[in-house]
Curated annotation (Swiss-Prot):
Signal peptide: none
Lineage, uppermost ranks: Bacteria, Pseudomonadati, Pseudomonadota, Gammaproteobacteria, Oceanospirillales
Xref: PANTHER family: 50S RIBOSOMAL PROTEIN L32, LARGE RIBOSOMAL SUBUNIT PROTEIN BL32
Protein name listed in UniProt: Large ribosomal subunit protein bL32
Gene transcribed to yield this protein: rpmF
Compositional bias segments (type: Polar residues): 53-62
Length: 62
């Protein structure tokens, strides 16, 4: 079984963790409505690449 001989320093631990950070999500402004949405995802109003993908039906919460 692999067991380290010496304790790793805070510096080495930090160097190892330097690649663990998640990149910020790429955001794009919609040209039609001006809303901000994630790249390659449907905008909140149901549009994707200039087309209405999901129809916005009237949602009566009863």
């Amino acid at each position: 079984m692999a067991v380290q001989k010496n304790r790793k320093t805070r510096s080495k631990r930090g160097m190892r963790r330097s690649h663990d950070a998640l990149p910020a999500a790429a955001l794009t402004e919609d040209s039609n409505t001006g809303e901000v949405h994630r790249r390659h995802h449907i905008s909140p109003d149901g549009m994707y690449r200039g087309r209405q993908v999901i129809s916005q039906g009237d949602s009566d919460d009863e």
